[in-house]
From Swiss-Prot:
The lineage of its organism: Eukaryota, Metazoa, Ecdysozoa, Arthropoda, Hexapoda. Belongs to the poneritoxin-Ae1 family. Its main location: secreted. The modification Cysteine amide is found at C19. The keyword Disulfide bond applies. Expressed by the venom gland. Keywords: Amidation, Disulfide bond, Secreted, Toxin. GO terms for cellular component: extracellular region. This is U1-poneritoxin-Ae1f.
Length: 19
């Protein structure tokens, strides 16, 4: 499933957000 990060961050391949 798709996970959207907030504040313009993007989802890292391993999970979590990169800002």
């Amino acid at each position: 499933s798709f996970y959207a990060c907030t504040n313009g961050c993007w989802v890292k391949p391993g999970g979590g957000c990169q800002c």
